[in-house]
């Protein structure tokens, strides 16, 4: 199957699962409406899909939410089968995704760095060496 079709199907799955979470149709109390589906990677034969989940909640609550989604995967898969026009609805695997939180932490670390050199001093020394 073409990569474009797989990416489009992954995006449709992401949107549908997000809608199920936001609408509260998943009754598991571990599944918070603050969970977000970052991306979905569908296998080439459409048999499997990896669903990457993150949240701004603490790591423990996010992992509990992922377990809740795993327990509700049958319901989610049935809902997807009704909405998507595919012969076989992929088997869903939910994965805790730390990449967004790690990215935010990295940006915060970079912003907290203090530079000991003054940019004006660097320009002044560069200009004097060019004049020689």
UniProtKB/Swiss-Prot annotation:
Localisation: Cytoplasm
Residue intervals passing through the bilayer: none
A cellular-component GO term for this protein: cytosol
Keywords from the named record: Cytoplasm, Ribosome biogenesis
Gene Ontology terms: biological process: maturation of SSU-rRNA
One GO MF term attached to the UniProt entry: ribosomal small subunit binding
Primary location: cytoplasm
Family membership noted in the UniProt record: Belongs to the RbfA family.
Role description: One of several proteins that assist in the late maturation steps of the functional core of the 30S ribosomal subunit. Associates with free 30S ribosomal subunits (but not with 30S subunits that are part of 70S ribosomes or polysomes). Required for efficient processing of 16S rRNA. May interact with the 5'-terminal helix region of 16S rRNA.
PANTHER family attached to this UniProt entry: RIBOSOME-BINDING FACTOR A, CHLOROPLASTIC-RELATED
Subunit field text: Monomer. Binds 30S ribosomal subunits, but not 50S ribosomal subunits or 70S ribosomes.
Name under which the protein is recorded: Ribosome-binding factor A
